[in-house]
Amino acid sequence: MITKRQLLKLSLGLVAAASGATVMAADTSPIKIGLILPMTGQSASTGRQIEAAVKLWVAQNGDKVAGRKVEIILKDDGAVPDATKRIAQELIVNDKVSVIAGFGITPTALATAPLATQSKTPLVVMAAATSSITEASPYIIRTSFTLPQVTIGIADWAAKNKIKKAVTLVADYGPGFDAEKFFDSQFRLNGGQILDKLRTPLRAPDFAPVLQKVLDAKPDALFVFLPSGQGAAFMKQFAERGLDKSGVRLIATGDVTDDDQLNDMGDVALGVVNSHHYSAAHPSPTNKKFVDAFQAANKFRPNFMAVGG
C-alpha cells in the first residue's frame, strides 16, 4: 500500500517535472500549489476538513521543500465545475502554480482534467472518488479513495449476513453510478437480488419520495451512497418515514455516516453498517496521534476527507 509520505514524494516529483528543471540551490522562489475546495455550499464540510488537514501537515512538517517555501493558494469553487475550471485556469496562467490539488466532487476534477493535460500541470485529487478520474489525464494522481474500493466489501458483507433482497439508493452522478454498479454486480454474484435502483439529485435532494419506494418494495436491506455532507439530512428522513423501525437494514458507504456529522444523527445511526477506507475511531497508535493533533488544532474531529488532504 502506498503511504502518505510516498504520495508526498510523488507530488513533489511532479512539482519538479512541472517546473521543467531540477530544483537548483540558487532558486529560492516559492513553490506555488493551488488548492481548490468547496468552502461554501452543501459540500463545505469537505473543504473544511481538507483545509484543516493541510494546515496541520504544514504546522507539523514546515513549509519548505529543498530550501524553497511552499505557498498554498486556497480558492473556493463551491463544488461548481464551471467555477473550478475558471479558477484552475487563473491559477495556471496568473499565479503560475506548479500543482493544483483539492477537488471535492468528481465533476470538478473532470472539468479541470483537460487543463492539466494542456498545461502539463499535475492535479492531486484529495476527495473525488469516481474510479475513472485518473483516466481523464496522465497528470492526475489521487490521495483519497474510489467507490469500488469501499462498495464491494459491503456487498460481500450483506451476502454473508442473510441479506437476500436489496434496494440501492445513490446520488445521481459519477460516484453514485460507481457505487450502484459495483454493489449490484457483487451482490448478485453472491446470489442476492436487487429489487430497485433509486437515484436522487446531487443538489438539494428530497429523500421522501424514494424512501417511500423503499418501504413499498420491502427489501431486506437498503444500500446507500450519498456524498459527504448529505448524511444527516438523509438519516433524519429515514427515521421520519419509519424505516428505522420497519425491519429494513441500512447498509452504506462511510460517506453517509461520516465522522464530521455522526453526532448530529442521533440514535437512528445505531445499527447502520458501512464500509469505508477510514474511521476516526480506528485504534492504531498512528491514527490516535493524528486524531488528537487534528482535534487540538481545529476543535472538531477529522473524517475521511481529512486523510485525503
Each language-model region and where it sits:
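N-terminal secretory signal peptides and thylakoid transit peptides that target proteins
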Residues: 1-15
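Extracellular/periplasmic Venus flytrap/periplasmic-binding protein
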Residues: 86, 130-132, 139-241, 278-289
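Extracellular/periplasmic periplasmic-binding protein-like sensory domains
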Residues: 235-309
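Signal peptide-proximal N-terminal region
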Residues: 28, 51-72, 189-192
